[in-house]
Amino acid sequence: MIQRRRPVPFELGPVHFIGIGGIGMSGIAEIMLRIGYTVQGSDAKASANTERLEKLGARIFIGHDAAHVEGASAIVYSTAVKADNPEMVAGRDKRLPLVRRAEMLAELMRLQFSVAVGGTHGKTTTTSMVAALLDAGALDPTVVNGGIINAYGTNAKVGEGDWIVVEADESDGSFLKLKSTVAIVTNIDAEHLDHWGTFDAVKKGFQDFIENIPFYGFAAVCTDHPEVQALTARIENRRLVTYGTNPQAEVRVSNIQMGPEGAQFDILVSPLSGDLVLYEGLKMPMAGHHNVLNATAAVAVARELGVDADAIRAGLAGFGGVKRRFTTTGVANGVRIVDDYGHHPVEIAAVLKAARAVSTGKVIAVVQPHRFTRLRDLMTEFSSCFNDADTVIVADVYTAGEAPIEGVDRDHLVEGLKKFGHRRALALESPAALPALIAAEAQSGDLVVLLGAGDITNWSYALPGQLEALAK
């Protein structure tokens, strides 16, 4: 039973979440439940997230209906919720406070010192790593993440310490509502232009994100990324801690080695004033150059927050990873199956580079493009980001509610891959055809990585059993 304490100084009815099963919404709902709010919410269908929240005491409605908000004190919604949603309409009619997801997260952050992790890619993993190092340092943070942290079995945790660590989502600009003590910027790419309009606007958004921190805070920024390095030149009134592999970085990672068990590396801290600090032979059970950079960001922050070297070393060595981030779902007939959320060309290239580093055989990529607009805007990049895969299997586009766009589909991506020189790019006729296709392509020692933000994750968990059945 959750021990409730009074979160506000007066009686408050249930807080209603529209789309409570979403990964971002469910984390905030869980934190609010655990600190004493009465929480309810609706979603289109039941899920592991709604079931978990129901067990914690939330009232869950399946489907959307105006009657669900009867008696609610406020409504929390995300940009995915349409204005004509019946619960939104009812909330407006009742003049209830309509609170955006990021605004509610900002309310939770206001009560503690906070670390907000931003960047086009790597936010979820970096958030999890910061949490792991603060846990190892006995700081016991509260955490709200955009993915399931394997060590917690959930994407949120209420800690007893002074710090809260959150993932800051830039996709709709709402991360600018998060006034954090510490900010992290992992990288900046031209993504979510449907909201921002131009890449210049994206870059200005990240500048504002950093400038939202107080004078006593700091931002950890990856100057290996050219746009982040350019951003540092525009920040004049906030303290920056730079990190990366480049010699100019204040927190520099080097001697990176990859293997089947993960990564090993050194980190040298060269503060502008003070002594050099060397963390030698750090080990992490997660592969990929991009994940080493994410770990370097976490070390930079943990060190500033007072976590000692032994705790940093132990926290990295024991890092349990994040669901859907290079997650092994099984091994069938010697073929390793990996599930990954990567759905942007930069992410896909990084994941495949990691796969190449740990695989003793071929790397076979199965990709489900996510959104027609993303594929249209980045068709050239998608056509050239699979070089580390021996075979690329392309599924139909996961629409995410978008209408089809002429000339933007599975077959055009396969054609683009071939034009850019890929030697083996195949179209997947249907999900049902995947097991037989993988059985024909893969042999013992190969690694199959399924990539995408849609329902391809379900295929990755079914595939090991399907391959074993075919082998009988």
Curated annotation (Swiss-Prot):
Species of origin reads Caulobacter sp. (strain K31)
Q: Which SUPFAM superfamilies match?
A: MurCD N-terminal domain, MurD-like peptide ligases, catalytic domain, MurD-like peptide ligases, peptide-binding domain
* CC per GO annotation: cytoplasm
Name the major location: cytoplasm
This protein's record includes keyword RNA-binding = no
| Molecular function via GO | ATP binding; UDP-N-acetylmuramate-L-alanine ligase activity
Q: Which InterPro entries does this chain map to?
A: Mur-like_cat_sf (IPR036565), Mur_ligase_C (IPR004101), Mur_ligase_C_dom_sf (IPR036615), Mur_ligase_cen (IPR013221), Mur_ligase_N (IPR000713), MurCDEF_pg_biosynth (IPR050061), UDP-N-AcMur_Ala_ligase_MurC (IPR005758)
What PANTHER family does its record include?
Answer: UDP-N-ACETYLMURAMATE--L-ALANINE LIGASE, UDP-N-ACETYLMURAMATE--L-ALANINE LIGASE-RELATED
Establish whether keyword Ribosomal protein is in the entry.
no
Which GO biological process entries does UniProt record here? Answer: cell division; cell wall organization; peptidoglycan biosynthetic process; regulation of cell shape
- EC no. given is 6.3.2.8
Phylogenetic placement of the source organism: Bacteria, Pseudomonadati, Pseudomonadota, Alphaproteobacteria, Caulobacterales
| Location(s), subcellular | Cytoplasm
Q: Which residues form a coiled coil?
A: none
Gene3D superfamilies recorded for this chain? Mur ligase, C-terminal domain, Mur-like, catalytic domain, NAD(P)-binding Rossmann-like Domain
Q: Which UniProt keywords apply?
A: ATP-binding, Cell cycle, Cell division, Cell shape, Cell wall biogenesis/degradation, Cytoplasm, Ligase, Nucleotide-binding, Peptidoglycan synthesis
Function, as annotated = Cell wall formation.
Q: Which amino acid positions bind ATP, per UniProt? A: 119-125
Q: Name one Pfam family in it.
A: Mur_ligase
| Gene name of the record | murC
Concerning its family, UniProt says: Belongs to the MurCDEF family.
Q: Which named protein is this?
A: UDP-N-acetylmuramate--L-alanine ligase
Report the top EC class in one word: ligase
Q: Which reaction does it catalyse?
A: UDP-N-acetyl-alpha-D-muramate + L-alanine + ATP = UDP-N-acetyl-alpha-D-muramoyl-L-alanine + ADP + phosphate + H(+)
User: So, what pathway does this thing act in?
Assistant: Cell wall biogenesis; peptidoglycan biosynthesis
